[in-house]
Each structure stands twice: as structure tokens, then as C-alpha cells.
């Protein structure tokens, strides 16, 4: 039977991170997939629970989590109610969060220890996952979906000067209609950690098997990002999904009980990739 177990662990700056593990109770020691959501995302967005169900039904455990500063709270995990935390977020914070999640899974204090860990990262979570994979031998395989090839691609370059002057920039959330604040500390993080946070440079250091998946209809993060990642790491495998947008046909809320066709194509390819030795 497919079951779900919930956890709450401390992330960066001690801020709580909600997580859930979806698994088949007849296969409690199955290989573990850790899923990292993207910018303005959260673990229960749209089709993420169906994604977890799919992989649990096909021989994997699936652990997804909310980054500590993604703007949600442990009380309201579906809404961006903590914009103060969102404003304080940095890429280094997200790397610290992901490390905490991997440590939690690896140590096995609250769940059967994971000796085989795979990462799936979406959009900005893809960039974070690339860096983490380059740094951490515990990660055996990497899958990126609609990943960015550079963090500075998340905002207009022309906005940086004003951002540095004012100390704050606001990004519009088309779904919630919120204006979400970002402190200039995000830019300072890039300034101080240029080598570590250079996604393309880190991509070149990834030695683990890596599947890059991108839709050719992605208007948020164009296909050129995937091509740049492939150029940085020629050993990676690139899959282009025809008609796939940034979320592979998914939206929030997702009221259907089945995955959209582009996302199902993604799942089938990832299943094949992770199942091959």
C-alpha cells in the first residue's frame, strides 16, 4: 500500500521545513528520490503529489520538502504568508536546506536510511540540485526539469542597478497576484560566492549520471538553458519534450487524478533513467 509520512525538520537559520515521504510499505528500503521545487514553488504545488505517487508505485521512495525561506509556513504550507522569509532567501540558504534534507534521509533516524539517493530539481531547484550534485557523492543520479543555467537569469539584468540602490526588488506572482519582495542580499550572495554559485561551471563538475529534461514550449526558462547545461556537461543526457511548457502541462491547483501528457512523458523517461544501472 502507498503511504505518506510527514516530517518537520530545521532548515537554514533554524526555520522549519515541512517534508513528506511517499512510499510503498512493502518496499521501505527502496531507492530515494528527493525533489527540490523551484522559485515561487512549494512541495504540494499542482501535480507534485501525483508525481510522488507515480514514483512510489514504480519502486522508489519520494521525499519532497519546502525550502525554509520559500514564503510558506509550517501552519500554512500552501500559501505565501511569510514574505519576510521569502525576502531573506538566498541560494546559499537553499543549498544549506537541501543538505539538511539529504542528511536527514542519509542518517535514517526517522525513516529507513537511504543508501541510494537521486535528486530531481525543477527550475531554480534544478540549479540548486546541479551544484549540490557536484559537491556531494551521496547523490547517485541527477534529473533536472526545466532547470535554469544561471541564477541571474531569474530577473531582468536591467533591474539589478535599481535593486542595489533600493535594497529591495519585487517580483510579481501571476497566480496569487502578490508582489513578492527580494532583498539585495540575494545579489550579495551571488557576489560573494561566484565560483560556487556558477551553475554552468558546477555542471561541468558533475560526474554522476544526469538527465536534463526541458520542454520546447517553455517561455519562463527557454530551451537554451538546457542546451547550455548540455554544453557544460556533454556526458549528460538531454531530453526535449515537444509541446512541454515550464511545468510540463501542470498548473495549480491541479484537480485531475492523472498527470498531463508532457509530465507523464517526463515520468516515464525518468523512470527508465533511474532504473538503468
Q: What does each of the following model-derived ranges do?
A:
Residues 1-27:
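N-terminal cap/lid segment of alpha/beta-hydrolase-fold proteins
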Residues 26-71:
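Short, surface-exposed "cap/lid" segments of acyl-processing enzymes
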Residues 48, 208, 222-231, 253:
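Short alpha-helix in the alpha/beta-hydrolase fold that links the catalytic acid
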Residues 84-109:
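Alpha/beta-hydrolase active-site loop
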Residues 101-163:
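Primarily recognizes the serine-hydrolase "nucleophile elbow" in alpha/beta-hydrolase
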Residues 205-207, 212-214, 218:
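Short beta-strand/loop motif that positions the catalytic acidic residue
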Residues 217-221, 246:
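Acidic catalytic loop of the alpha/beta-hydrolase fold
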Residues 244-277:
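Catalytic active-site module of serine/aspartate enzymes centered on a nucleophile-bearing elbow/loop
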Amino acid at each position: 500500500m502507498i503511504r505518506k509520512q510527514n516530517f518537520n525538520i530545521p532548515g537554514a537559520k533554524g526555520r522549519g521545513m515541512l517534508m513528506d515521504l511517499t512510499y510503498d510499505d512493502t518496499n521501505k528500503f527502496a531507492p530515494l528520490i528527493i525533489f527540490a521545487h523551484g522559485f515561487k514553488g512549494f512541495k504540494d504545488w499542482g501535480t507534485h503529489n501525483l508525481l510522488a505517487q507515480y514514483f512510489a508505485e514504480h519502486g522508489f521512495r519520494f521525499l519532497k520538502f519546502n525550502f525554509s525561506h520559500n514564503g510558506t509556513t509550517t501552519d500554512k504550507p500552501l500559501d505565501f504568508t511569510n514574505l519576510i522569509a521569502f525576502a531573506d532567501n538566498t541560494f546559499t540558504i537553499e543549498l544549506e536546506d537541501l543538505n539538511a534534507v539529504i542528511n536527514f534521509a542519509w542518517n535514517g533516524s526517522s525513516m529507513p536510511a537511504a543508501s541510494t539517493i537521486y535528486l530531481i530539481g525543477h527550475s531554480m531547484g534544478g540549479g540548486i540540485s546541479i551544484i549540490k550534485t557536484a559537491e556531494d557523492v551521496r547523490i547517485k543520479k541527477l534529473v533536472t526539469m526545466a532547470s535554469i543555467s544561471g541564477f541571474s537569469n531569474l530577473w531582468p539584468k536591467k533591474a539589478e542597478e535599481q535593486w542595489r540602490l533600493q535594497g529591495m526588488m519585487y517580483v510579481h506572482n501571476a497566480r496569487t497576484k502578490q508582489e513578492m519582495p527580494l532583498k539585495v542580499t540575494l545579489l550579495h550572495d551571488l557576489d560573494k560566492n561566484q565560483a560556487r554559485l556558477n551553475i554552468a561551471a558546477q555542471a561541468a563538475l558533475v560526474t554522476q549520471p544526469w538527465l536534463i529534461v526541458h520542454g520546447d514550449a517553455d517561455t519562463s526558462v527557454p530551451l537554451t538553458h538546457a542546451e547550455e547545461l548540455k554544453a557544460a556537461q556533454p556526458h549528460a543526457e538531454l531530453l526535449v519534450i515537444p509541446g512541454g511548457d515550464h511545468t510540463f502541462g501542470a498548473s495549480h491547483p491541479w484537480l485531475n487524478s492523472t498527470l498531463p501528457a508532457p509530465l507523464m512523458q517526463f515520468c516515464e523517461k525518468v523512470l527508465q533513467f533511474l532504473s538503468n544501472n
